[in-house]
């Protein structure tokens, strides 16, 4: 099937050192950014792709794009999570694009793999791959690329970012990357193997305080 728009497969180096490769690309290609419908980063280990966040303005297009993924395998369900803005602070290469106003997404992944020992280390070897998860995830990615590429227009950027830029506490500098999707101060979703997951945080939990400071909104 030939898509209506170009689909690019891109590999980045220097993510762990500060998103060096993706930042360099967006800096060197500013004239292309307004033409990019969306960026999807697959870099979360061997578990199966299980979902994405969706803003209200994107929801209709995303329901069209992801209906095939939702019907792909009942044992590996896929869902869209309604959010006020695309979460930031995960620390992967889609954030280089979000910072320049391009919709960027990091897949939610679920499954039986314990990725913390291997991912992004010298222990990240082929024996950690789970074939059925990889086959499912690559199929979801292919369907997504084709679906977004065949939309009538670009994916909406209206209300794309979380209020205040959606950055993690502490601004662009310090602070730990929790790895959560927020609705207000409530955790809508917790990314597996993230700092939040390791701390025992779960979807539905509400952030009330950080240290001795009360949290009333995402800008607190």
Where are these regions (language model features)?
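Soluble non-cytosolic domains of exported or imported proteins
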Residues: 16-20, 56-60, 87-91, 128-139, ...
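Alpha-helical metal-binding/catalytic segments enriched in His/Glu/Asp
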Residues: 1-19, 141
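A fold-wide structural signal in alpha/beta-hydrolase
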Residues: 6-8, 103, 206
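C-terminal recognition in membrane/secretory proteostasis and scaffolding
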Residues: 118, 155-220
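Solvent-exposed, polar/charged alpha-helical surfaces in well-ordered, non-transmembrane soluble domains
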Residues: 23, 64, 68, 95, ...
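Structured segments of extracytoplasmic/periplasmic soluble domains
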Residues: 2, 28, 32, 68-76, ...
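His/Asp/Glu-rich mid-to-C-terminal helical/loop segments that flank catalytic regions of hydrolases
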Residues: 5, 115-164
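Metal-dependent peptidase/peptidase-like ectodomains
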Residues: 12-116
């Amino acid at each position: 099937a030939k898509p209506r728009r170009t689909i690019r497969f891109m590999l980045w180096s220097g993510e762990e050192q500060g998103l060096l490769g993706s930042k360099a690309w967006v800096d060197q290609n500013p004239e292309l950014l307004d033409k990019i419908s969306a960026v999807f980063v697959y870099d979360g280990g061997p578990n199966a792709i299980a979902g994405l966040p969706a803003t209200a303005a994107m929801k209709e297009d995303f329901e069209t794009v992801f209906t095939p993924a939702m019907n792909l395998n009942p044992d590996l369900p896929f869902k869209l999570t309604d959010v006020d803005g695309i979460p930031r602070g995960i620390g992967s290469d889609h954030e280089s694009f979000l910072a320049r106003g391009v919709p960027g997404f990091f897949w939610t992944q679920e499954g039986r793999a314990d990725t913390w020992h291997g991912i992004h280390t010298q222990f990240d070897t082929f024996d950690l791959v789970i074939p059925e998860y990889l086959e499912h995830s690559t199929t979801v990615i292919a369907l997504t690329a084709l679906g977004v590429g065949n939309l009538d227009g670009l994916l909406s950027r209206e209300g794309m970012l979380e209020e205040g830029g959606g950055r993690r506490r502490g601004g662009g500098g310090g602070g730990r990357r929790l790895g959560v999707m927020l609705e207000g101060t409530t955790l809508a979703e917790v990314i597996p193997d993230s700092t939040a997951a390791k701390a025992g945080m779960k979807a539905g939990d509400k952030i009330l305080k950080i240290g001795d400071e009360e949290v009333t909104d995402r800008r607190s």
